[in-house]
Amino acid sequence: MSMSSSNITSGFIDIATFDEIEKYMYGGPTATAYFVREIRKSTWFTQVPVPLSRNTGNAAFGQEWSVSISRAGDYLLQTWLRVNIPQVTLNPLLAATFSLRWTRNLMHNLIREATITFNDLVAARFDNYHLDFWSAFTVPASKRTGYDNMIGNVSSLINPVAPGGNLGSTGGTNLNLPLPFFFSRDTGVALPTAALPYNEMQINFNFRDWTELLVLQNSALVAPASPYVPIVVPTHLTVAPVLGPVQVWANYAIVSNEERRRMGCAIRDILIEQVQTAPRQNYTPLTNASPTFDIRFSHAIKALFFSVRNKTSASEWSNYATSSPVVTGATVNFEPTGSFDPIANTTLIYENTNRLGAMGSDYFSLINPFYHAPTIPSFIGYHLYSYSLHFYDLDPMGSTNYGKLTNVSVVPQASPAAVNAASGAGGFPGSDYPQSYEFVIVAVNNNIVRISGGETPQNYLSGSFVTLLNRRKWSREGPMIMVQ
């Protein structure tokens, strides 16, 4: 058996190959020495997670409620929603053909809308569609399983149970949803809460009702009939589900007295991200396979997300495929055989010009995210068009001001599978009864938050306010809004 060998002297041969191209790549007064590390110091700080106090409303299914953002901390870094999902039991007296499960992406779809407000004026918002898109294109594979566990994609919740079976655990199941507001993207854009003493800051939630989140099916209803059944209490459930404890947690940074004194001394502009969702529109491949949808966004758009949602079951919010999920015993297949992307190709038009002409869905689902997103979605039907070289980067790397464009429209050409499934002729379970669809498009845009305080450290709290630039629909005077 031979012995492996090497010696230090041979390395000098490599060093001796230094020539003209190496002069271009190596050396000089600004060259980095990789073997003498320079410490990059930071200011002194600590982090503290705290629950936020309830402000208005009742945190329950189908309700609107809010929490107040505390100013006890200096910078708000991240927030997340923690919910206890109750155990649900399907009525044991029902026929064995019935099954019950929670919708996929439960924590996403619990949120009809979430907003952050300054003195009741909305600074940022998102909905369940943005949560679906954002997680699909930004959560890396190394965190995907953990994220699925946090938002409810676990077998005890999304796998169907027969009559007498229980969804969830005794005492409920605790789920967590990271809230993707602009300040959570990076510590450099954290919200300086200590510099905003005269702003009433709130996070507001609009929750869906439990009837919109539970999926009841009856396999005795065979094609062409839909297997989905509206839930009735006490016929299907003996009691209506009630949420357990609901909390919003915030992670704050506490800084030194010196840094705190400087926070409000000068005007500070923060480049933030906002979300716009166009009104959903019916998508009917049988009658119009190439519909044209007007999209009216504004500001510097850095990315467009779009999909055709399968709404055959009103409670299946995160299905963007041609087929409905298929239940077999105690399992569910969310992408059954014969399930495809409802969109074959897409045309983007503005200024009477084809910005993108009949680009195949593989471009929006694979190629564009491969180059411009942190990850490629693992499920069918998610589409991205990024104006930015890397839309997840906070720095400006490309955008288009939709406020300056006219007659913007998108034409999603239906795939043959969508046409067949719409008529119930898909040929496989899940598409052998008529499927219905709607078109969803979401934009991420940049905007600027201006935070301004007093002129001196002694009175920096006296004049703090937040200004949102270029938000014309919120304007009080001209192109800006001021939150005093």
Curated annotation (Swiss-Prot):
Principal subcellular localisation of the protein: virion
Q: Cross-referenced InterPro entries, in alphabetical order?
A: Capsid_N, MCP_C, MCP_C_sf, VP_dsDNA_II
Q: Which UniProt keywords apply?
A: Capsid protein, Late protein, Virion
Q: Does the keyword Transcription regulation apply?
A: no
Q: Which domain of life is it from?
A: Viruses
**GO MF term (any one):** structural molecule activity
Q: Name one GO cellular component term.
A: viral capsid
Name the Gene3D superfamilies for this protein: Adenovirus Type 2 Hexon, domain 4, Major capsid protein Vp54
Report if keyword Transferase is assigned. Answer: no
- Name its cellular compartments: Virion
Q: What does this protein do?
A: Major capsid protein that self assembles to form an icosahedral capsid. Represents around 50% of the total virion protein mass.
Give the quaternary structure: Homotrimer.
The family assignment reads: Belongs to the NCLDV major capsid protein family.
Q: What name has this protein been given in UniProt?
A: Major capsid protein
Instruction: Name the source organism.
Output: Wiseana iridescent virus
Q: Quick one: which gene encodes this? A: MCP
